[in-house]
């Protein structure tokens, strides 16, 4: 994607959030403005945790996906003890890609994808959850742990 297009999409998304924040303040809805403000900051903070990982292939796939595919909002939950995830970047990227390709066929409206990364002494656990109005729960991947019309969750365990 051309740099100007990327820049424009990023600015457009941020401008939309700031306009909504401004509207809440203008209408005197301080509670809604405060909640939205905290949500925006938390989203940036959580995304930064992911972007700081030593996983360039996974990060590149994520960035390409958010710029090209407007069907998903993303959330992150990252609790890693070490930088060992960097040793499994190719595996992580393949898992992310597999989940996203599967999820694209299951929703028509904007839906939330939550990526969770947890680490113990023995393994790294990656959980991908799609929540929203899921139209199809048939033929889920083998790594599926939950599948219904509200959530489809896939899990990958990487032994260290």
Predicted regions span which residues?
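Conserved signal-transmission helix
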Residues: 1-3
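Histidine phosphotransfer helical core of two-component systems
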Residues: 18-59, 82-88
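Short beta-to-alpha transition helix within the HATPase_c
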Residues: 53-70, 137-141
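Active-site alpha-helix of zinc metalloproteases
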Residues: 8
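Conserved beta-strand-loop-beta-strand hairpin that lines the nucleotide-binding pocket
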Residues: 79, 93, 109-138
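Conserved ATP-binding N-box helix of the HATPase_c
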Residues: 11-27, 86-119
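Conserved catalytic submotifs in the C-terminal HATPase_c
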Residues: 75-83
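Flexible, glycine-/charge-rich segments associated with ATP-binding catalytic modules
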Residues: 26, 140-160
């Amino acid at each position: 994607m051309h740099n100007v297009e990327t820049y424009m999409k990023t600015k457009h998304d941020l401008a939309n959030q700031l306009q909504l924040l401004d509207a809440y303040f203008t209408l005197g809805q301080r509670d809604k403005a405060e909640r939205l403000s905290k949500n925006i900051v938390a989203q940036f903070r959580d995304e930064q945790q992911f972007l700081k990982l030593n996983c360039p292939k996974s990060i590149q796939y994520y960035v390409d996906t958010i710029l090209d595919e407007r069907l998903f909002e993303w959330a992150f939950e990252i609790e890693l003890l070490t930088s060992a995830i960097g040793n499994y970047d190719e595996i992580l990227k393949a898992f992310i890609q597999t989940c996203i390709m599967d999820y694209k066929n299951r929703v028509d409206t904007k839906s939330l994808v939550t990526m969770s990364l947890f680490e113990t002494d023995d393994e790294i656990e990656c959980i991908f959850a799609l929540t929203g109005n899921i139209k199809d729960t048939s033929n889920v991947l083998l790594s599926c742990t939950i599948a219904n019309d509200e959530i489809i969750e896939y899990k990958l365990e990487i032994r260290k």
